[in-house]
């Protein structure tokens, strides 16, 4: 029994609401869930909360591309995220969204307190402006070369390669992500958070034990470079919360995102009146708050976040725990290799408990990257969980049921039981310190001992002799009791298996009951609890991940399989039947304005045999075009796709209406037509050069 009950609030970083969860994401949620489940198993009051990070430029852009409201898009993504987490047995106490009334009020509260305490500065800045779209370009509207490490193709707020943060104006060779134009400078009024005012507090906090040593050392480098005032403003258009008393100005997503932890807990408090928000977040709180994050967002969580909390009168977290990235088969996750695996694709093929165990077996308290080697994954799960753990019960339970009325014997020799129980503090310390890999090794070493005991005793031989029936009863009862202890130790990692084992033993598995005497206790008939990992299922998962390359959030509909098949059967020598036209000069070609367009709507045209009516978004303007592709496409195949159109073709009045351009397609005609589909990174309105 825990000596005293702790009050704990634990969070995982908020997944961004513009796409699906993948196995790289799942590392963090499994890591946090194991820690939360362990705390609850020890009898502590632990609340595990999370939310979707639902604001910012990327979400606004994607919603525009899909032709739907941002609110509708994030609601759908939230639903998908929650289902993925639930199916991986991640047990949040509350899952919310940063686009909520609780979060709006909390963000405004913290901002106003910072402002009133003198930590918000206002000044006019020169910001990048898109001359073609007549709009300011916030961070994610701009891409260019990182000013720190010189990595190309980086966003305007932080570098994915080196983790540095900067303003969009610092980018080298910036380009508008909206139009592709080179931006110009224009003045605008912005609000800044005075981060340098908290340097002393932050230096003390970062060396207080709140961070891993690797993180604290990295922060020392940033302190040496000097802290900068932090721009917390974004100009309209922006999907987020408007700043109080500042029409047309919005909170930068990284201001209200971590506040989402507080907003989600506020939402939980409303559902559970016995919970007190101030008891966990008040300045003098004695409760514990822990954040689990990826190493790519250390800067925000270890500098901006504690400073914002301190400056607005709230408590700082006890610790921020960072983890590394996930690689697959020793390399970065790859769509072309099928190793960029979505959570849902994994769930379609494999048991989530497999991955929970594999991640646990390789996790430590350090910030090292974790490699998901798919061959090792199958071998380890089969060896540890099936061959060692579950096999311990499957080899012995049948004898108890068939020969001893399903009742366990009183164990006379408790030497093994005592040895297993003696490891509970070691295993507990490993869970507490997030050294899950060490905990798994301790548990599997015990499983080896238990299996060796059964193999040496050979109860299947004992039961053949009348004078060894009681000895067989003792061996099998002892083995099952050891199995119960092992699964109790593993309950935070394997909750579904633990549930099955609880049904088998017909009693709950609790840490306090590890030493429970089960003499005379009746068990249920044994049922298979875990199947081996079959490599053909792993390979099918990888194959499906390759197929998923054709299904992106930007283009949710793909061509029908029969069209794809036809594409490979078209003549390999099209130039024979359709030779290249006469040469033109460059000036003639330059007159043609080709633009990326998104097909917002497609519909049949009454009394037209060949035409479909298309509504095309070309980036702030909608065009109506009649296209002769009815023989090759149905309207539902087209909606949401990107294509290429001739944007400066003179409008043509047809008897069905005005056609304001032309979409481009390839093929001999009839059903053998394929509209041009640009790379998913292209945006409506971009010029094709």
UniProtKB/Swiss-Prot annotation:
Motif ('KMSKS' region): 332-336
Binding annotation for ATP: 335
Pfam families named among the record's database cross-references: Anticodon_3, tRNA-synt_1g, tRNA_bind
Keywords: Aminoacyl-tRNA synthetase, ATP-binding, Cytoplasm, Ligase, Metal-binding, Nucleotide-binding, Protein biosynthesis, RNA-binding, tRNA-binding, Zinc
Binding site for Zn(2+): 146, 149, 159, 162
An example Gene Ontology biological process: methionyl-tRNA aminoacylation
E.C. code: 6.1.1.10
Cofactor: Zn(2+)
Motif ('HIGH' region): 15-25
Complexes and interactors: Homodimer.
Cited function: Is required not only for elongation of protein synthesis but also for the initiation of all mRNA translation through initiator tRNA(fMet) aminoacylation.
Record-linked PANTHER family: METHIONINE--TRNA LIGASE (PTHR45765), METHIONINE--TRNA LIGASE, CYTOPLASMIC (PTHR45765:SF1)
UniProt name for this protein: Methionine--tRNA ligase
Organism whose genome encodes this protein: Shewanella baltica (strain OS195)
């Amino acid at each position: 029994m825990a000596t005293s009950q702790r009050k704990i609030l634990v969070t995982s970083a908020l997944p961004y609401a513009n796409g699906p969860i993948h196995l790289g994401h799942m590392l963090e949620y499994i890591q946090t869930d194991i820690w939360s489940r362990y705390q609850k198993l020890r009898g502590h009051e632990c609340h595990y909360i999370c939310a979707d990070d639902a604001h910012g430029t990327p979400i606004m852009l994607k919603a525009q591309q899909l032709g739907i409201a941002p609110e509708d898009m994030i609601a759908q993504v939230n639903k998908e995220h929650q289902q993925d987490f639930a199916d991986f047995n991640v047990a949040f106490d509350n899952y919310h969204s940063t686009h909520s009334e609780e979060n709006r009020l909390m963000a405004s509260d913290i901002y106003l307190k910072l402002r009133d305490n003198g930590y918000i500065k206002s000044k006019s800045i020169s910001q990048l402006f898109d001359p073609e779209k007549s709009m300011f370009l916030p961070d994610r509207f701009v891409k260019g070369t990182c000013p720190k490490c010189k990595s190309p193709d980086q966003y305007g707020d932080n570098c994915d390669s080196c983790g540095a943060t900067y303003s969009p104006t610092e980018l080298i060779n910036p380009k508008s992500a909206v139009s592709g134009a080179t931006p110009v400078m224009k003045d605008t009024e912005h609000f800044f958070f005075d981060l340098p005012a908290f340097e002393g507090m932050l230096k003390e906090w970062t060396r207080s034990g709140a961070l891993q040593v690797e993180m604290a050392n990295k922060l020392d480098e940033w302190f040496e470079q000097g802290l900068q005032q932090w721009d917390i403003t974004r100009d309209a258009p922006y999907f987020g919360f408007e700043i109080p008393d500042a029409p047309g100005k919005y909170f930068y997503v990284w201001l209200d995102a971590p506040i989402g932890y507080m907003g989600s807990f506020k939402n939980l408090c409303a559902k559970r009146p016995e919970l007190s928000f101030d008891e966990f977040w008040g300045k003098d709180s004695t409760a514990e708050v822990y954040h689990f994050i990826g190493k790519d967002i250390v800067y925000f969580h270890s500098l901006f976040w504690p400073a914002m909390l301190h400056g607005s009168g709230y408590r700082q977290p006890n610790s921020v725990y960072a983890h590394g990235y996930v690689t697959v088969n020793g390399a970065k996750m790859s769509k072309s290799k099928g190793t960029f695996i979505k959570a849902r694709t994994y769930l379609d093929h494999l048991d989530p408990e497999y991955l929970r165990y594999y991640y646990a077996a390789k996790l430590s308290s350090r910030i090292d990257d974790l490699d998901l080697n798919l061959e090792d994954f199958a071998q380890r799960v089969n060896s540890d969980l099936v061959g060692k753990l579950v096999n311990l019960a499957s080899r012995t339970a049948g004898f108890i049921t068939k020969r001893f009325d399903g009742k366990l014997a009183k164990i006379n020799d408790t030497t093994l039981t005592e040895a297993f129980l003696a490891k509970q503090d070691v295993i507990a310390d490993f869970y507490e310190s997030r050294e899950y890999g060490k905990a798994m090794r301790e548990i599997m070493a015990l499983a080896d001992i238990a299996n060796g005991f059964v193999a040496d005793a050979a109860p299947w031989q004992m039961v053949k002799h009348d004078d060894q029936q009681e000895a067989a009863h003792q061996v099998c009862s002892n083995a099952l009791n050891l199995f119960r202890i092992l699964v109790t130790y593993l309950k935070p990692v394997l909750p579904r298996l633990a549930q099955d084992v609880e049904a088998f033993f017909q009693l709950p598995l609790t840490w306090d009951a590890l030493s429970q005497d089960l003499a005379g206790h009746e068990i249920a008939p044994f049922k298979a609890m875990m199947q081996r990992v079959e490599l053909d299922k792993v390979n099918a998962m990888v194959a499906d991940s390759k197929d998923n390359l054709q299904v992106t959030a930007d283009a949710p509909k793909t061509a029908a399989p029969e069209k794809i098949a036809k594409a490979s059967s078209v003549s390999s020598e099209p130039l024979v039947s359709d030779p290249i036209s006469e040469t033109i000069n460059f000036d003639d070609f330059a007159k043609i304005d080709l633009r990326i367009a998104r097909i917002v709507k497609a519909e049949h045209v009454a009394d037209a045999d060949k035409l479909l009516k298309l509504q095309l978004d070309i980036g702030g303007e909608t065009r109506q075009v009649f296209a002769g592709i009815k023989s090759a496409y149905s309207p539902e195949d087209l909606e949401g796709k990107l294509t290429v159109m001739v944007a400066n073709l003179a409008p043509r009045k047809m008897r069905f209406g005005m056609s304001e351009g032309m979409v481009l397609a390839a093929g001999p005609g009839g059903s053998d037509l394929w509209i041009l589909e640009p790379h998913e990174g292209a945006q409506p309105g971009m010029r094709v050069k």
